[in-house]
Design a protein with these regions (language model features):
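Conserved, mostly hydrophobic/aromatic
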Residues: 8
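C-terminal amphipathic alpha-helical interaction region
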Residues: 25-32, 404, 409, 424, ...
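Extended, charge-enriched "interface" segments that sit outside catalytic cores
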Residues: 29-106, 381-383, 394-397, 404-410, ...
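Glycine-rich phosphate-binding loops that contact phosphosugars or nucleotide phosphates
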Residues: 101-270, 344, 348-372
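Anionic-ligand anchoring segments at beta-strand to alpha-helix junctions in alpha/beta enzyme folds, i.e.
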Residues: 110-162, 296-338, 483-490, 494
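Active-site phosphate/pyrophosphate-binding segments
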Residues: 190-344, 377-486, 497
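Structural motif
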Residues: 299-301, 348-352, 459-464, 515-518, ...
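Conserved, well-ordered active-site substructure
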Residues: 496-529
Length: 579
């Protein structure tokens, strides 16, 4: 009886605290603002929200009740150990002085290079593109590729004697990241700084990993031990996102305060239909069950790259057991007539943005459109949490575990086998591929296999350049406009840590276009019998094997030794194939 009274008192006090904070936000104009036009889908969403409220979903989320996602007792502890992101903003606010000191001490560097993949790199990349670097703070570079030309490009941009390298990996064992470390450690020592090489390095990892041990042995200047109960894609508001952000001068305290604001708006005492995170999750989950599983992001130019992070969060969390939500990031906005009935649009705008006529046209045409408005860039803190909650709730609606990634390891294992073959034979195994100049029939055959709800995934194991970006945009637009097929695009191996799980574990509606190029430059990996070029090629072959073993429709196109000409040929082939 006493326990019951204490429980009621605690819940009542939480409710009063939330009401107090919510009323204060209303008076000050703070708090999440969302508008939506769901047309004929509104009743279904309302019913889903009512069901979530009846199931006590908001309270169970914050109580870390694993049965919200799985009834399997074996998964109970595993899921609970992945929900630390719910309270990490408040936890990190206790370290504000640490971030201030880091921002001050980091001014001694001209550049910071973040070495990481997936959840360790995407939030820093968003912050880099959104905020740039404050005057007096170093410039941030994010390296999440094994492409030799890109690695050499970063090396050429920095003064290595004035650079800090952040080695970021939750597991401490990420192949790409450790390869990056080996290369830059060697570069530092080559430049005569062997005695103080460790002063140019910091590590972000879970406690007790092999990376923590390596960092201690090499005398790293900083070692940040992240809370271990947070999965990589949910780690934006932890050290993985905040350390790089603080170094470039982002106001970390205010960004965390915005996240706490959102946490109060999404509190366990806030009903599902008034709860911004639960509401968005209900929309995504319910519409996905009705075939509208392409969450198409349209972002204000001021936060144009926020979708990089959202893409991984949604794809890796929901793409499993043959189910999943396909995030469409970076696809140019088209006229209403080019879209099918498999979309839901989320428009992320900024206060002061002019009306978006393309979005208005989509609403008028009856497409479901959700509009989320940010006050300024620091509202990203709240948006990180809103989308994490929404994705977790969407997972509950789809009845899948939103916190595992059962198929990610598959391509990694295949890559290891390919590398083992290279070590023993001195060459990579062959793969069926077609030159870009002769790819029309293969691409036409691939697109003709598209069923209702299909999407084209462009997987480019190439150097990212303005030319490649323009070519990919042209391919996406042509396919979308002529075939009414949604498109995604990613650079390898980066996308393997993002949408790779969805490709293999999600709905079998994907059409896969793998694009590779011949590397004219290469970089050795110290301590390994293979180079970055060989590693990148092995990763593309490993993923190709994974696709083929699942009998997924895939075409591999080679750009040759002149990527610019190869891209032009590929764009022409696609435009011809969709006529």
């Amino acid at each position: 009886e006493v326990e019951g009274v204490e429980s009621f008192t605690k819940s009542f006090e939480s409710l009063l605290d939330t009401l107090k904070k919510e009323s204060a936000k209303i008076r000050t104009g703070k708090g999440p603002r969302q508008w939506y036009s769901l047309a004929t889908l509104q009743p279904a969403v309302d019913a889903r929200l009512a069901a979530l409220q009846k199931d006590d979903a908001p309270r169970r989320l914050w109580a870390k009740d694993s049965t919200l996602w799985s009834s399997d007792p074996a998964k109970r502890d595993e899921i609970r150990d992945r929900l630390g992101w719910l309270s990490v903003a408040e936890q990190m606010l206790e370290h504000v002085q640490e971030f201030r000191d880091l921002a001050r001490d980091g001014r001694t560097y001209s550049d910071v290079v973040l070495l990481g993949m997936g959840g360790s790199s995407l939030c820093p990349d968003v912050l880099r593109n959104t905020f740039g670097s404050t005057k007096g703070h170093p410039k941030l570079h994010v390296l999440d590729t094994t492409d030799p030309a890109t690695i050499l490009g970063v090396r050429a941009k920095i003064r290595i004697q004035d650079t800090l390298f952040i080695v970021a990996s939750k597991s401490g064992e990420t192949t790409e990241t450790l390869s990056h470390f080996a290369y830059f450690w060697n570069e530092i020592n080559k430049n005569g700084r062997s005695g103080a090489a460790g002063r140019h390095f910091a590590a972000i990892t879970d406690p007790g990993t092999s990376l923590e041990k390596l960092a201690k042995e090499h005398g790293f200047r900083w070692i940040f031990r992240n809370p271990p109960d947070i999965g990589g894609r949910y780690s934006a508001l932890s050290y993985f996102g905040l350390v790089p952000g603080s170094l470039i001068g982002v106001n970390i305290e205010e960004m965390l305060e915005r996240a706490v604001e959102m946490a109060h708006s999404c509190a366990d005492s806030v009903p599902a239909d008034k709860n911004p995170g639960v509401w968005l999750g209900a929309v995504m989950g319910e519409l996905a069950t009705r075939g509208r599983n392409k969450v198409t992001l349209i972002a204000s130019p001021k936060v144009a790259t926020f979708g990089y992070w959202v893409e991984q969060l949604i794809a890796e969390s929901t793409g499993k057991q043959g189910k999943g939500i396909v995030p469409i990031e970076g696809e140019p906005v088209g006229k209403p007539a080019v879209y099918g009935d498999d979309r839901v649009f989320v428009y992320i705008r900024m206060d002061g943005d002019a009306p978006n006529r393309a979005v208005q046209a989509l609403e008028k045409a009856g497409q479901p459109v959700v509009t989320l408005t940010m006050r300024d860039k620091l509202d990203l803190g709240g948006e990180f949490l809103r989308w994490e909650i929404a994705t977790a709730i969407a997972g509950a609606v789809l009845r899948i575990d939103a916190f595992d990634q059962p198929n990610v390891q598959e391509s990694k294992d295949n890559t290891k086998k390919v590398l083992a073959s290279f070590k023993s034979r001195g060459k990579l195994p062959p793969a069926d591929s077609v030159p870009a100049s002769r790819s029309k029939s293969g691409i036409k055959g691939l697109l003709d296999r598209g069923k209702d709800g299909a999407y084209l995934a462009i997987m480019a194991y190439t150097t990212r350049t303005p030319g490649s970006e323009a070519a990919i945009e042209a391919i996406r637009t042509s396919v979308r406009d002529r075939k009414h097929i949604a498109t995604t695009a990613g650079y390898g191996p980066r996308f393997l840590h993002s949408t790779g799980q969805l490709h293999k574990g999600g709905p079998r509606t994907g059409l896969f276009l793998q694009i590779v190029q011949d590397d004219t430059k290469d970089v050795s990996i110290p301590g390994q019998p293979y180079s970055f070029s060989i590693l990148k090629q092995a990763q593309s072959l490993g993923d190709l094997q994974s696709m083929s073993s699942r009998r997924l429709p895939v075409v591999r196109v080679t750009l040759g030794r002149d990527p610019a000409a190869g891209w032009r040929s590929l764009v022409a082939a696609v435009k011809s194939a969709v006529k």
